[in-house]
């Protein structure tokens, strides 16, 4: 593309028009038009692609309108939006606003026990991000389609709480951690350690409290439902049906949400979901509460297991590590993979579903931004970083001379890539 500003503006403006036209045509074809755009993973491929292109083009056009002063202004706004959402979550405003109908600011402030003027200020800033809306008579507030979903979906509620109670405080200690421990790779010398004044690793901290364990597991489940991390990308990244009735070991599989998605799409596969005992107990209960068909649940079993211990399931078709190894430094990542090697059968594969960092500017900025965000989140919580393909290859070569990354695939619109590792 021509790098002249006029050419770039013309390019992205035409993409907005073309993409929006296709999306509008799809919306008008529906019997009941939704109030928000459906996830790009739940619509026809062409429409999903148009949504991705629209987001990227709009993002780039917005960038062109900002001079340095505007950039700093927007950063200030973004910080205050985050602060406002955290405030609204802390005082349970999302759950206190009725899912249907509206409530006055006066009554809401009384129920929440917060000053009415502060409540109004926080909600009205959130409204600029399509969270809440004023409805009916002056002084009445109601849910927007987005905030209603954030209030009613239990996994999104957990994600919101995790963001407010853990992610935000940790990020504020990023500078302090680097100043205190420059260059450290220790699992207990992180921004999270400073934010919560503890001396173990992040996962030690989580495992010490069952409530933290459940909140973290539920938030990870919620993340997997967003379009960029949707489990449907994993379903499309490999010919799973070629495994027949093989066993997939879902290591660190938390609530089993990934195995459930695969089981629903591939009716012959069987699954063993492994995680820490507290997580397993909660996950079994959640699976029972979901009342899924027996054709799905009878093919999924849970097993307490530590990633660093030898893999007890022998000869499985696939050992799946989805968003697991990025939480661990290279040494421990190698140890986890080595724990699988003795269990491998002649045709067994190891699947790593994780971010593969691209060259700067080589993919859409809306996708790269999320990858770079995750890169820093990992550093702040676990003193690790996301990896490039060369980093992944170096780790696999340290595990065994007989293992190779044979295939790497990133489904369009996905943040995660699938790395297929086989014995050679």
Swiss-Prot record:
Detail which positions bind S-adenosyl-L-methionine: 275
Question: A GO molecular-function term, please?
Answer: O-methyltransferase activity
Q: Which residues form the active site?
A: 326
Superkingdom is Eukaryota
Q: Name one GO biological process term.
A: secondary metabolite biosynthetic process
This protein's UniProt keywords? Methyltransferase, S-adenosyl-L-methionine, Transferase
Q: Which cysteines are joined by disulfide bonds?
A: none
Tell me the pathway. Answer: Secondary metabolite biosynthesis
List its EC numbers: 2.1.1.-
One Pfam family recorded for the sequence: Methyltransf_2
> Knockout consequence?
Leads to the accumulatio of aurasperone B and fonsecin B.
What is known about what this protein does? Answer: O-methyltransferase; part of the gene cluster that mediates the biosynthesis of aurasperone B, a dimeric gamma-naphthopyrone. The first step in the biosynthesis of aurasperone B is the production of gamma-naphthopyrone precursor YWA1 by the non-reducing polyketide synthase albA, via condensation of one acetyl-CoA starter unit with 6 malonyl-CoA units.
Which family is this sequence assigned to? Belongs to the class I-like SAM-binding methyltransferase superfamily. Cation-independent O-methyltransferase family.
For this entry, the protein name equals O-methyltransferase aunD
Give the species.
Answer: Aspergillus niger (strain ATCC MYA-4892 / CBS 513.88 / FGSC A1513)
């Amino acid at each position: 593309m021509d790098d002249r500003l006029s050419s770039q503006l013309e390019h992205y403006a035409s993409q907005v028009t073309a993409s929006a036209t296709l999306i509008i045509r799809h919306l008008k074809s529906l019997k009941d038009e939704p109030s928000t755009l459906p996830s790009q993973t739940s619509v026809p491929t062409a429409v999903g692609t148009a949504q991705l292109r629209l987001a990227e083009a709009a993002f780039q056009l917005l960038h062109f309108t900002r001079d340095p002063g505007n950039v700093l202004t927007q950063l200030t706004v973004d910080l205050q939006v985050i602060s406002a959402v955290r405030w609204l979550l802390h005082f349970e405003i999302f759950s206190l606003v009725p899912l249907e109908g509206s409530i006055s600011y006066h009554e809401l402030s009384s129920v929440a026990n917060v000053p009415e003027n502060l409540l109004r200020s926080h909600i009205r800033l959130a409204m600029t991000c399509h969270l809440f809306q004023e409805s009916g008579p002056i002084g009445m507030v109601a849910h927007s389609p987005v905030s209603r979903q954030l209030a009613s979906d239990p996994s999104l509620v957990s994600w919101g709480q995790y963001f407010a109670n853990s992610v935000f405080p940790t990020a504020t200690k990023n500078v302090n951690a680097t100043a205190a421990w420059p260059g450290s790779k220790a699992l207990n010398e992180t921004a999270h350690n400073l934010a919560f004044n503890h001396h173990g690793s992040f996962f030690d901290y989580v495992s010490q409290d069952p409530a933290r364990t459940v909140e973290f597991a539920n938030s990870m489940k919620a993340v997997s439902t967003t379009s960029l991390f949707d489990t449907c990308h994993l379903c499309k990244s490999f010919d799973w049906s070629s495994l027949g009735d093989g066993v997939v070991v879902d290591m660190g599989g938390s609530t089993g949400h990934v195995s459930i998605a695969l089981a629903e799409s591939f009716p012959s596969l069987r699954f063993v979901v492994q995680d820490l005992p507290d997580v397993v107990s909660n996950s079994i209960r959640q699976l029972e509460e979901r009342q899924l068909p027996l054709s799905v649940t009878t093919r999924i079993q849970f097993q307490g297991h530590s990633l660093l211990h030898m893999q007890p399931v022998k000869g499985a078709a696939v050992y799946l590590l989805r968003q697991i190894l990025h939480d661990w430094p290279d040494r421990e990542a190698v140890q986890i993979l080595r724990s699988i090697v003795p269990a491998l059968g002649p045709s067994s594969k190891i699947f790593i579903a994780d971010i593969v960092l691209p060259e700067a500017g080589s993919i859409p900025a809306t996708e790269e931004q999320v990858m770079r965000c995750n890169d820093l989140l990992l550093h702040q919580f676990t003193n690790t970083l996301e990896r490039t393909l060369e980093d992944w290859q170096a780790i696999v070569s340290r595990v065994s001379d007989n293992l190779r990354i044979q295939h790497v695939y990133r489904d369009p619109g996905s943040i995660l890539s699938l790395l297929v590792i086989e014995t050679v």
